[in-house]
């Protein structure tokens, strides 16, 4: 909310209000002069003349980019056609944006009963939720080298083959509401003599403790 007061001694003519904001932080900026009717903001607002003793209130609203964290600074400037106008023509406000994210990981196996020499196919789905994007998402899945041929294990991300699986993968930013699917293939060793239990852990900036899911192959 921006309030412009004219304390005199003369009418403030041709008053123009400009809102300075970072387009990487805010989008869809709108303004209202009565709190009910909203208009898209386009570079400046022409407020016309403001009489002595009068004030004008301008309301602003905008959506915050889901990747934004921390302080968001917003500045407004006003100009007038009065040559010798005096007063405060700039004001700013800082709002602290706190992340609101959820991160869910689900792990499954295409076939849960295999024999030595068969290939395990793990399917891992990571879903980001909340009002903020999940940042610096990392998936870790350490295969059991006593039961699986870890050196020949391969993986794919969203259906695209990526090569040899090394145990961890940086998924970067996952936009809220989106999912990433990671497939891992590994051959069961001929010497395998027990169930293959496997655990996946997914962390992010907001959830450093991680979320886990597991699958067991018999």
Sequence positions of predicted segments:
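Exported/extracytosolic protein signature
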Residues: 1-218
